[in-house]
Amino acid sequence: MIERNYYLNKLIRNMWNGEIKVITGIRRCGKSVLLFELFYHYLLAQGVLEDHIIRIELDQRRYYRYRNPIILCEDVEKRIHDKAGDQFYLFVDEVQFTSTVRDEENGGIEVTIYDMLNELKSYKNLDVYVTGSNSRMLSKDIATEFRGRATQVHVYPLSFQEFYSSVRGDKQTALDQYMLYGGMPRVAGMTDERDKKEYLTNLYEELYIKDIVERNNLEREDILNAILDYTASQIGSLTNPTSIANALTSMRHEKINTSLVSSYLDHTMDAFLISMARRYDIKGKSYFNYPNKYYYTDIGLRNARLNYRQYDPGHMMENIIYNELIIRGCSVDVGMVLDRRNKEKIQREIDFVVNDGDRRIYIQSAYQMDTEQKENAETQSLKLTGDFFRKIVIRMDIPHNFFDADGFFHCRLIDFLLQEVELY
């Protein structure tokens, strides 16, 4: 079993903190394993009795009755009500499958899973943990629905460091596999490449697409697929719903509305399939509305979406770096800086402006810088920031790390992903 110590330790630190622990992330990224295996076995090792851990998996048929939140709440209360001296743990998996129901015993008012979990939270002998695969369970929604009393633990597919801890062997070979097949936990345990491709393709088509269509009652699954094809082929490129709509209109010979594209993009982000990096004006200290960049939560899913036809190592590397920074808890934007050195003012791009509290770094992703022209193209925007924050160029084509004459740190991708270098 692959260790997910970063997330496990976060759960352990927040035990009995008086809040509901909400574990979010794309489906099949390891949320259930984290809660129902890793954390479960940790509790058993600490002496917690097995019958004091209440496990409810809402995507399993034997637990379908608990999709009614009133039934779930009542059954849990029966287990713990007369045992105030004992400590119980409640695990609820894939909580987004619950329904809103009417409580006929209380005037027919509508009741949600949030209402019932808030009621259960009032029991001092119960510590509550739930998982969910939809971003409506994130940020302000968690604060609102759980009345400001929730701790969020967002789980991602395996980082390269986690992936390599499982597969071991030659680091470059492992990185090549990671760039092609990504970090979905089950893939890390597979050896046959056909099995990996089949698993990722089925995951995409039979789980994610169906989830998005059914959950949001989408009428145009074909448009959703076209949008996903387009974003997969354009990772690392600036785009927006209007340009996507125009491209699809041209390709499909039918009018595709920008509002439809924008709505469908939101649904894919709600499902954690893709995420958006906004453009940030470094000198003006403000955000642009459009265009932005879209990245896949797992690069293997992106490659599966394109049937492994479009192997673009430069943009794939950029996607992997973005994901790694997000996994580390950083705030990541696409940097823009105005070049006034010539008569024509040009907006130049820095791949990532990375903020962690009051600390900032700039990162350029450079697959190859084997000519002076390429080196100038990658570094000139870094020279225009006008500040003294650290500037890093992450590369695939160098045998060791070094500082150049401008003080920019050139770092091997493998060293960055294995956290063998300090960012700040």
What are these regions (language model features)?
Residues 2-18:
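Pre-Walker A adenine-sensing motif
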